[in-house]
Curated annotation (Swiss-Prot):
InterPro entries to which the protein is assigned, alphabetical: Ribosomal_uL10, Ribosomal_uL10-like_sf, Ribosomal_uL10_bac, Ribosomal_uL10_bac_type, Ribosomal_uL10_CS_bac
Listed name of the protein: Large ribosomal subunit protein uL10
Primary role: Forms part of the ribosomal stalk, playing a central role in the interaction of the ribosome with GTP-bound translation factors.
Subunit structure, as described in the record: Part of the ribosomal stalk of the 50S ribosomal subunit. The N-terminus interacts with L11 and the large rRNA to form the base of the stalk. The C-terminus forms an elongated spine to which L12 dimers bind in a sequential fashion forming a multimeric L10(L12)X complex.
Segments traversing the membrane: none
GO biological process, one term: translation
Native organism taxonomy: Bacteria, Pseudomonadati, Pseudomonadota, Gammaproteobacteria, Chromatiales
Length: 176
């Protein structure tokens, strides 16, 4: 069933709005995936807060025009599914990477972050980025480490004194 002009405009505006607020985008070729597998991918995308959509390439080119993902326009060829990360820059990459491990027919074509077009090989690097919460906890651990070491050092002085006095006591008791 062909789309009329109003439907096309609605799709373009919806994808453009999502692309304008997204942190990263991944385009993957889904040729050979069954309907069940695509439904499974969509369900996982909803759980990860990733916007996933199959859009005609001409409409996708119009939708990403004027956004950070305009660099993807030339590469939008073939049957592609677009995944946009809403909260976490690595969410779409993790979703596609994990799904592609199980389903070899899902092939990554384009990866884009912050207006830069990355190769399909960069998907692994983007997917391994920590989430916001993980990054904050790593930063806090790094900031807390010197304080912990300082506290242990201060605690060591009285501990060493106690061990020395105990050793002298044991030595005197042994000689007596």
């Amino acid at each position: 069933m062909p789309l009329n002009l109003e439907d096309k405009k609605a799709i373009v505006s919806e994808v453009a709005a999502v692309a304008a607020s997204a942190h990263s985008a991944v385009a993957a070729e889904y040729r050979g995936l069954t309907v069940t597998e695509m439904t499974e991918l969509r369900a996982k995308a909803r759980q990860s807060n990733v916007y996933l959509r199959v859009v005609k390439n001409s409409l996708a080119r119009r939708a990403v025009e004027g956004t950070d993902f305009a660099c993807m326009q030339e590469g939008l060829v073939g049957p592609l599914v677009l995944a946009f990360s809403q909260d976490d820059p690595g969410a779409a990459a993790r979703l596609v990477k994990d799904f592609a491990k199980e389903h070899k027919k899902l092939e990554v074509k384009l990866v884009s972050v912050g207006g830069q077009l990355l190769g399909p090989g960069e998907l692994e690097r983007l997917a391994s980025m920590p989430t916001r919460d993980q990054a904050i906890s790593l930063l806090m651990a790094v900031m807390k480490a010197p304080l912990d070491k300082f506290a242990r050092t201060l605690n060591e002085v009285p501990g060493k004194l106690v061990r020395t006095v105990a050793a002298i006591r044991d030595q005197k008791q042994a000689s007596a």
